């Protein structure tokens, strides 16, 4: 940790965005070592004064769960778990060339307090009410700003797209109860959308179907990307030269007004010369050619027991009576779950570890950035795609972001949320429609 950010440096960092656990600051100063960088800083929950819900310190059970992975426990002691988990664990599954762990930098007293005040007016009100920068922290994670290219040629615009793809497959686990068999036919994303609509968290259910994006079919990838423009929510954001031009800043955006979509498309067209159809083709081609979603899907599929199976192994790990089994009356299901409870500890840990890695993969985002390739360039460090409609080649890079380890004790939350989502959809079907109607476009294809 050689780099130190001092109080006077706070003015050079501006608001870029935030999620539940971290806030992102973008550098606007003149230091060559900081240009093209963002700072990922921890937040605390205002009502509890506790760190936001991510895993920064391991419990004794987590130490045993993750202890066999070299370097991971040591990273907790050095306060660099997010960096280590991304580079040691997730890069094995997603590819080291698509994972940027960043570097830990020290921060002097008052830096975060000043930075927090400076960005206050830029943060969504609901985020401000819920959380704040952890002013007591003494370090942060410095990462490349993947909405930009390093050393971008003069006059060349960079377009970056952030996609939170969510779970891209339908589970087939034998541990899913008959009452919840709808999970094998309808995507978790779609079912959750209807619960969110019912709770008033969104004003319109999304048209996006993760199965389209992960299908490997160019036509269906086109459909998925097109759907983002009418209902981006927190799944889709576009940046031009590092500045957000479409989508929400705080990860909680609802629908975008049609006028905003039109303005975004006008801005895109002005700086890139691309019409919407060109842009969708460019993004689709890069997703298809890079193969990154194939790696993401394979990582998500490490969850082969579903939460309805994995929750029982969680109770094995914490050596507590299974609270789920207490409420089950189905004899056949109890027999299956008894088999899980008889597994040795190392097998239970392997299944839960894979489940948590999968949970990170289901919740992370993919950042794909583009810039026009200079004519005559043959030795670029980046891959490229050629867009026939504008007769232009584009450099592109793809990185996964938000690769934090999920806390072990969140297993109970995952189970309860899963049951809540499925129970609501089973009772109500598609909100606003006839629950007896078959789900539209969500069954196996």
Swiss-Prot record:
Molecular functions per Gene Ontology: ATP binding; inositol-1,3,4,5,6-pentakisphosphate 2-kinase activity; metal ion binding
Keyword Coiled coil: no
Catalysed reactions, semicolon-separated: 1D-myo-inositol 1,3,4,5,6-pentakisphosphate + ATP = 1D-myo-inositol hexakisphosphate + ADP + H(+)
InterPro entries: Ins_P5_2-kin, IP5_2-K_N_lobe
Secretion signal span: none
Domain notes: The EXKPK motif is conserved in inositol-pentakisphosphate 2-kinases of both family 1 and 2.
Protein family: Belongs to the IPK1 type 2 family.
Described function: Phosphorylates Ins(1,3,4,5,6)P5 at position 2 to form Ins(1,2,3,4,5,6)P6 (InsP6 or phytate). Phytate is a regulator of intracellular signaling, a highly abundant animal antinutrient, and a phosphate store in plant seeds. Also phosphorylates Ins(1,3,4,6)P4 and Ins(1,4,5,6)P4 to produce Ins(1,2,3,4,6)P5 and Ins(1,2,4,5,6)P5.
Protein name, UniProt field: Inositol-pentakisphosphate 2-kinase IPK1
Organism in which the protein naturally occurs: Oryza sativa subsp. japonica (Rice)
Lineage of the species this protein comes from: Eukaryota, Viridiplantae, Streptophyta, Embryophyta, Tracheophyta
């Amino acid at each position: 940790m050689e780099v130190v950010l001092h109080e006077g440096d706070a003015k050079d960092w501006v608001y870029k965005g935030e999620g539940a656990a971290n806030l992102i600051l973008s550098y606007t100063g003149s230091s060559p070592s900081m240009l093209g960088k963002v700072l990922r800083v921890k937040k605390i929950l205002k009502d509890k004064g506790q760190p936001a819900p991510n895993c920064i310190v391991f419990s004794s059970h987590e130490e045993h769960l993750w202890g066999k992975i070299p370097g991971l426990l040591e990273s907790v002691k050095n306060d660099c778990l997010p960096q280590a988990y991304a580079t040691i664990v997730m890069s094995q599954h997603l590819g080291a060339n698509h994972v940027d762990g960043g570097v830990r930098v020290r921060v002097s007293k008052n830096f975060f307090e000043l930075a927090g005040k400076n960005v206050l007016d830029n943060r969504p009100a609901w985020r401000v009410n819920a959380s704040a920068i952890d002013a007591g922290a003494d370090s942060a994670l410095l990462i490349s700003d993947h909405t930009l290219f390093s050393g971008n040629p003069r006059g060349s615009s960079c377009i970056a797209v952030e996609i939170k793809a969510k779970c891209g497959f339908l589970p087939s686990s034998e541990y899913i109860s008959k009452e919840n068999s709808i999970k094998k036919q309808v995507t978790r994303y779609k079912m959750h959308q209807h619960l969110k609509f019912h709770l008033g968290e969104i004003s319109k259910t999304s048209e996006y179907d993760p199965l389209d994006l992960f299908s490997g079919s160019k036509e269906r990838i086109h459909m998925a990307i097109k759907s983002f423009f009418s209902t981006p929510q927190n799944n889709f954001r576009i940046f031009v030269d590092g500045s957000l031009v479409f989508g929400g800043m705080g990860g909680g955006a609802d629908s975008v007004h049609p006028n905003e979509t039109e303005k975004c498309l006008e801005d895109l067209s002005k700086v890139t010369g691309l019409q919407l159809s060109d842009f969708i083709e460019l993004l689709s081609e890069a997703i298809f050619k890079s193969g990154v979603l194939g790696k993401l899907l394979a990582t998500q599929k490490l969850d082969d027991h579903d939460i309805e199976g994995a929750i029982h192994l969680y109770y094995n790990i914490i050596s507590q009576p299974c609270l789920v089994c207490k409420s089950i009356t189905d004899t056949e299901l109890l027999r299956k779950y008894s088999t899980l409870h008889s597994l040795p500890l190392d097998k239970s840990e392997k299944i839960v570890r894979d489940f948590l890695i999968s949970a990170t993969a289901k919740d992370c985002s993919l950042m794909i950035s583009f810039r026009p390739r200079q004519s005559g360039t043959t030795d670029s460090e980046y891959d490229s795609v050629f867009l026939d409609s504008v007769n232009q080649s584009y450099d592109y890079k793809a990185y996964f972001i938000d690769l934090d380890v999920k806390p072990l004790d969140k297993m109970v939350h995952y189970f309860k949320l899963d049951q809540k989502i499925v129970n609501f959809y089973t009772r109500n079907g598609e909100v606003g429609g006839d629950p007896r109607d078959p789900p539209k476009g969500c069954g196996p294809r």
